[in-house]
Structures are given as structure tokens and as C-alpha cells.
Regions:
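Short amphipathic alpha-helical interaction elements located at domain edges
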Residues: 1-187
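Short conserved AdoMet
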Residues: 146, 221, 296
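Short, low-complexity N-terminal intrinsically disordered segments enriched in polar/charged residues
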Residues: 177-210, 218
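A beta-strand edge to alpha-helix "cap/lid" segment located at domain peripheries
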Residues: 179-188, 241, 245-320
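A short gly/proline-enriched turn/hairpin at secondary-structure junctions
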Residues: 186-190, 225-235
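Short, well-ordered alpha-helical segments enriched in acidic and aromatic residues
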Residues: 210-223, 227
Length: 320
């Protein structure tokens, strides 16, 4: 059987991803608009009590400053309508602008709105607002999962808001500036992963941690693919590099163990489990992650799937 991106997606099929994440997001999208906004607010308040959320970078916030200034000048009724329009994907200028922002810029925008709601600058959720039974069930589902899954759910709820970009004829993606690559010091270099000695995997981890994305993309086959959690594969060097710049800056990968095994036609399957820390939550949240690599006979990365695992015990599951 010939190797393809589609067939590569199924390596290490016993890997148990956190299916509760897309399931909860799907339930969230079925809620009425008012409940969606209230649920985000209640979840934001609860997470703020448990986790230290990093203040968004000032450079990133300059992309939203004009929009935030408009919102600050609005009446409470206008602010409420705008947030409803963002949640429902209404076609209006601010919703179109929002749709062009990268995930991190959208997160920074909602972080600032949350701060302003606490300060009374932006209309708060009405005092005594009661979530519907369905919304309460979704909120409880968010409470029941681990912090890494919680922030993934909340991230995706706001990332999917705004006007549908597929209906925009021409637009430019607005992303934060590419941060300069870091030196890979001896102190921070990953020199070994128990069970895996392949140098390409070590280079992948070290280059990602150092924001050395130009070097990182050279590890991939030209027709290679990368599958982020709960998404379809991204195929081709240019598209993968864009993903690195927009979604992977300042991540900290902490691989713990792995397994390597031959596959047909000279390919090699490698599975690594470990944790990833994000710049938003740092050491407070370590996401439980599996990386499922398929290397081609030239020892290039033909495919890698990144899975948010169902539970910490899955870190020990290296079976196939």
C-alpha cells in the first residue's frame, strides 16, 4: 500500500485524543448567543481564580487597539450588540476585521474585553444572569476536564467567532510579528528522549522551542503534512511554515518518552509523549500531548500529527 497523508493520519491508532474538546465546542456552538457570551465570561472568571494568565504582548495588542478604541466609545447597548454579532458571525466591519486576526490576537482582544468588563468599561453580563440548562451542562463539561483541555476549548470558542473568512474575497491575515529565533543553549537543549534516538526528532523539538522555524521547516519533506489537534492536515512547506509563525511562537515542548518502529517502504513511525506549555499560561498549564511522526526513507518528516491527549495516563501509552 502506498504511503499518503491520509494513510499517515492513522499511525498509532490506539492514541486516545481528548474527543471531549471538539464535542464540547460543538455543544457550545448550539447554544443561543447570549448563553455563549455569558458562558465565556463565567469560565474566564473561574479560570482567573485558578491560573495566572499572562498579559498580552503590547506589540500584539497594537493590532486591536483601533477596534478596542471604537468599542470603548460605544454605549453599553452597542457593545452588547457587537459581542452578539461577533458570536453569530454577522457581516459588519468589525466582524470582518476580527476574522482576519490570528488566534493569539483574538485571544488578546477577548482578554482585554474581560478586563474591561471587570472594570465596568465594557457592558458586563447582567447581574443575576442565569444560564440555560444546556449552557450549564456545557460549563460543567468545561469544569470537568483538565486545564489544558479547558484552555483549548475556550481558545477555539473565540477563534471561530467573527465573519466567515471563506466569504471574504480578498483579505490579508493579521498575525503578530515573528519573534527572533533564540539561541539553543546547552542548558535548554533536549539531548535525549527515552526510547527514541533519532536526531531529526530532537531537532524538531529544539528548533520549535527556539522559534527557529526556518530551520524547522527544513526537516519536512516538500510534500509533507502537519496535523494540529482536532484539525485537518496542513500540507506543503509554505502552509506549515505559516502555521508555525502564527500558532507556535514561544511554545515550550517537554518530551518525556517515545517509541520508534519501522514501517513499510522504508518509512519509520515514531511516537513521542510529553507536555507543552504555552506563553499564555506558562508553567501553570502543561498540555498532555502526543506527537505521531512518520519519517520517509530520506529521514525527512513526511507527516506529524499533534494530539491533545484524553488524560495524563495516555502519556504512558506508546502502543500502536
Amino acid at each position: 500500500m502506498s504511503i499518503s497523508i491520509e494513510s499517515a493520519r492513522h499511525i498509532f491508532p490506539e492514541t486516545l485524543a481528548a474527543d471531549v474538546v471538539p464535542a464540547t465546542i460543538a455543544r457550545f456552538k448550539q447554544l443561543r448567543i447570549e448563553d455563549r457570551l455569558a458562558l465565556i465570561w463565567f469560565a474566564y472568571l473561574e479560570m482567573g481564580k485558578k491560573l495566572s494568565i499572562a498579559t498580552p504582548d503590547e506589540v500584539n495588542m497594537r493590532f486591536v487597539s483601533s477596534t478596542l478604541s471604537q468599542i470603548e466609545r460605544m454605549s453599553f447597548a452597542e457593545q452588547e450588540q457587537l459581542m452578539c454579532d461577533l458570536a453569530s458571525g454577522t457581516d459588519r466591519p468589525i466582524c470582518r476585521i476580527y476574522a482576519t486576526w490570528s488566534a493569539n490576537i483574538k485571544l488578546g482582544f477577548w482578554f482585554q474585553l474581560g478586563k474591561w468588563m471587570e472594570a465596568g468599561i465594557v457592558t458586563p453580563i447582567p447581574q443575576g444572569y442565569e444560564l440555560s440548562a444546556n449552557a450549564l451542562a456545557v460549563l460543567q463539561a468545561i469544569r470537568d476536564v483538565d486545564p489544558g483541555q479547558q484552555i483549548t476549548i475556550l481558545r477555539n470558542t473565540v477563534v471561530d467567532m467573527g465573519f466567515d473568512t471563506s466569504q471574504l474575497e480578498n483579505y490579508s491575515r493579521v498575525a503578530e510579528p515573528v519573534v527572533p529565533p533564540k539561541e539553543i543553549s546547552d542548558k535548554n537543549r533536549i539531548t535525549a528522549i527515552p526510547g527514541v534516538e533519532n536526531p531529526i526528532i530532537l531537532e524538531y523539538m529544539n528548533n520549535m522551542n527556539a522559534n527557529q522555524f526556518d530551520a524547522l521547516i527544513q526537516l519536512f519533506a516538500p510534500d509533507g503534512g502537519l496535523q494540529p489537534p482536532f484539525q485537518r492536515p496542513i500540507v506543503g512547506s509554505d502552509k506549515i511554515l505559516t502555521f508555525f509563525h502564527e500558532d507556535c511562537q514561544n511554545l515550550k515542548l517537554l518530551p518525556e518518552k517515545g517509541v520508534i518502529e519501522p514501517a513499510e517502504d522504508g518509512y519509520t513511525r515514531i511516537k513521542i509523549t510529553g507536555k507543552v506549555q504555552t506563553p499564555w499560561f506558562g508553567k501553570d498549564v502543561g498540555m498532555n500531548i502526543a506527537w505521531r511522526f512518520l519519517l520517509n526513507p530520506e529521514n525527512q518528516i513526511f507527516f506529524v500529527a499533534i494530539d491533545l491527549l484524553a488524560s495524563p495516563k495516555e502519556l504512558l501509552n506508546l502502543g500502536h
